[in-house]
């Protein structure tokens, strides 16, 4: 997911996206532990997507306060 795509989302959509990504991250960790994970690089992608969503949500919250 690109940062420009994330910036287009509203605050509620960001929360939903974050919840979805965290759920996916949990499932990927579970797959890794059981040896069923096919694309191990997806774990890093999801982790970075979570960071992007959190960063942009924080920036939007700061804009509202300013």
Curated annotation (Swiss-Prot):
Q: Which organism is it from?
A: Rhizobium etli (strain CIAT 652)
Q: Does the keyword Ribonucleoprotein apply?
A: yes
Q: Name one Pfam family in it.
A: Ribosomal_L29
The organism's superkingdom is given as Bacteria
Q: Does the keyword Ribonucleoprotein apply?
A: yes
Family that this chain belongs to: Belongs to the universal ribosomal protein uL29 family.
Matches recorded under PROSITE patterns: RIBOSOMAL_L29
One annotated GO molecular function: structural constituent of ribosome
Keywords, ordered alphabetically: Ribonucleoprotein, Ribosomal protein
What name is this protein filed under?
Answer: Large ribosomal subunit protein uL29
**GO CC terms of this entry:** cytosolic large ribosomal subunit
**HAMAP family associated with the record:** Ribosomal_uL29
Annotated gene: rpmC
The GO biological-process annotations, alphabetized, read as:
translation
